[in-house]
Amino acid sequence: MASQTAIRRKLRARRKVREAAGERPRLSVFRSNKHIYAQIIDDRSGTTLAAASSSAVKTGTKTDTAAAVGRALAEAAVAKGVKQVVFDRGAYKYHGRVKALAEAAREGGLDF
């Protein structure tokens, strides 16, 4: 069962995403113990615009791999014409692998 802190963090992050999600696609992050997955979702049409995962990109440490996933996702999104997104980190803290993915996606051309 999730701790109360994690539940509050998840609800706070969801509220901020919901406020901005109407006009921009959402960059959703899922982190497992072994891999990290990210996708850009258009909630209005319910479609995935671009996706990347660490199972396809292998480079060194988990943090380096997360950064490579962020760069790959940004390249795919910019190729499809998506530049502005809302970052949905879920209940994950903005630290470590999640932060590395976000910073690499920003460097790759995404704006959030």
Curated annotation (Swiss-Prot):
<comment type="subunit">
    <text>Part of the 50S ribosomal subunit; part of the 5S rRNA/L5/L18/L25 subcomplex. Contacts the 5S and 23S rRNAs.</text>
</comment>
<protein>
    <recommendedName>
        <fullName>Large ribosomal subunit protein uL18</fullName>
    </recommendedName>
</protein>
<dbReference type="GO" id="GO:0022625">
    <property type="term" value="C:cytosolic large ribosomal subunit"/>
</dbReference>
<keyword id="KW-0694">RNA-binding</keyword>
<keyword id="KW-0699">rRNA-binding</keyword>
<dbReference type="Pfam" id="PF00861">
    <property type="entry name" value="Ribosomal_L18p"/>
</dbReference>
<dbReference type="InterPro" id="IPR004389">
    <property type="entry name" value="Ribosomal_uL18_bac-type"/>
</dbReference>
<comment type="function">
    <text>This is one of the proteins that bind and probably mediate the attachment of the 5S RNA into the large ribosomal subunit, where it forms part of the central protuberance.</text>
</comment>
<keyword id="KW-0687">Ribonucleoprotein</keyword>
<comment type="similarity">
    <text>Belongs to the universal ribosomal protein uL18 family.</text>
</comment>
<dbReference type="InterPro" id="IPR005484">
    <property type="entry name" value="Ribosomal_uL18_bac/euk"/>
</dbReference>
<dbReference type="GO" id="GO:0008097">
    <property type="term" value="F:5S rRNA binding"/>
</dbReference>
<keyword id="KW-0689">Ribosomal protein</keyword>
<dbReference type="GO" id="GO:0003735">
    <property type="term" value="F:structural constituent of ribosome"/>
</dbReference>
<dbReference type="GO" id="GO:0006412">
    <property type="term" value="P:translation"/>
</dbReference>
